[in-house]
UniProtKB/Swiss-Prot annotation:
UniProt organism field: Clostridium botulinum (strain Alaska E43 / Type E3)
GO molecular function terms noted in the UniProt entry: acetyl-CoA carboxylase activity; ATP binding; carboxyl- or carbamoyltransferase activity
Biological role: Component of the acetyl coenzyme A carboxylase (ACC) complex. First, biotin carboxylase catalyzes the carboxylation of biotin on its carrier protein (BCCP) and then the CO(2) group is transferred by the carboxyltransferase to acetyl-CoA to form malonyl-CoA.
Pathway: Lipid metabolism; malonyl-CoA biosynthesis; malonyl-CoA from acetyl-CoA: step 1/1
Record-given protein name: Acetyl-coenzyme A carboxylase carboxyl transferase subunit alpha
PANTHER family in the cross-refs: ACETYL-COENZYME A CARBOXYLASE CARBOXYL TRANSFERASE SUBUNIT ALPHA (PTHR42853), ACETYL-COENZYME A CARBOXYLASE CARBOXYL TRANSFERASE SUBUNIT ALPHA, CHLOROPLASTIC (PTHR42853:SF3)
GO biological process, one term: malonyl-CoA biosynthetic process
Coiled coil regions, renumbered to chain: none
Main location: cytoplasm
Pfam families given in the database record: ACCA
């Protein structure tokens, strides 16, 4: 068996998982919306500035249940990546997402989020329009939203840009996804002044689904087809649907105040030492 074939089916090191999470053919958030949900109707705009195409959101049906679905999505090709700003949302994207979540709360619809972003966009315009406050406001409002929230990290989960949609009751991750405060490249450059030490950085950062599940930061690791989700996207769809259904069943009989208290406790426990 040649080395390239072995590499294509065996992913073990954290850095290999980073590479798989960033793979150009990895299914996008839009792909999962189109293939997991029925009757999706997309909503646009934050009612303050404009529409951010890095975040897609709207209402849909999941197994005959009305849901609000939101995705931070990259593009499936170069042109679409440019249109979607390579999955880096502007503040109007986060405000749009929050608008849809508050609507979901009003109509008692569960919220399902898909996350795949290297981080929030850090351009001058984004800062001028309040990127920091948009993310902070999402964290605050999601912590007390009176409807179930399920978030799934499907690729990269980068920094506050990802966290803005992952203050959730259930956090799921694909087994080759990563979720961290910054990229391994950024970590190596800042801490060691050497961007070439990315593999070492990925090892010490504990960014994999398996590590984060062990620490209690995420709830479920979703298996991927051998070699990654891009090897068999339809099989990945089936695996994700099953875990979404499991998460919804676990939450369907929880009273609202209990749900909010458990969500609060979940995040307060992160980082505590026994």
């Amino acid at each position: 068996m040649n080395k390239e074939f072995i590499k294509s089916i065996v992913v073990s090191s954290p850095w290999e998982k980073v590479e798989i999470a960033r793979h150009k053919d990895r299914p996008t958030g839009k792909y999962y919306i189109d293939n997991i949900f029925k009757d999706f109707i997309e909503f646009h705009g934050d009612r303050l500035f404009g529409d951010d195409k890095a975040i897609i959101g709207g209402i849909a049906s999941f197994e005959d249940i009305s849901v609000t679905v939101i995705a931070i999505t990259k593009g499936a090709n170069t042109n679409e990546n440019i249109e979607r700003n390579f999955g880096m949302p502007n503040p109007e994207g986060y405000r749009k997402a929050l608008r849809l979540m508050k609507q979901a709360e009003k109509f008692n619809r569960p919220v399902i989020c898909f996350i795949d972003t290297p981080g929030a966009f850090c351009g001058v315009g984004a800062e001028e329009r309040g990127q920091g406050s948009a993310i902070a406001n999402n964290l605050f409002e999601l912590s007390r939203l009176k409807t179930p929230i399920i978030s799934i990290v499907i690729g990269e989960g980068g920094s506050g840009g990802a966290l803005a949609l992952t203050v959730a009751d259930k956090i799921l991750m694909l087994e080759n996804a990563v979720y961290s405060i910054l990229s391994p490249e950024g970590f190596a450059s800042i801490l060691w002044k050497d961007s070439k030490r990315v593999k070492e950085a990925a090892n010490v950062m504990k960014i994999t689904a398996q590590d984060l599940n062990e620490f209690g930061i995420i709830d479920t690791v979703i298996k991927e087809p051998r070699g990654g989700a891009h090897k068999n996207p339809q099989k990945q769809v089936t695996l994700i649907k099953k875990e979404i259904m499991n998460a919804m069943n676990e939450m369907k009989n929880i009273e609202t105040n209990q749900m909010i208290n458990e969500r609060y406790d979940k995040f307060r426990k992160i980082g505590t030492l026994e």
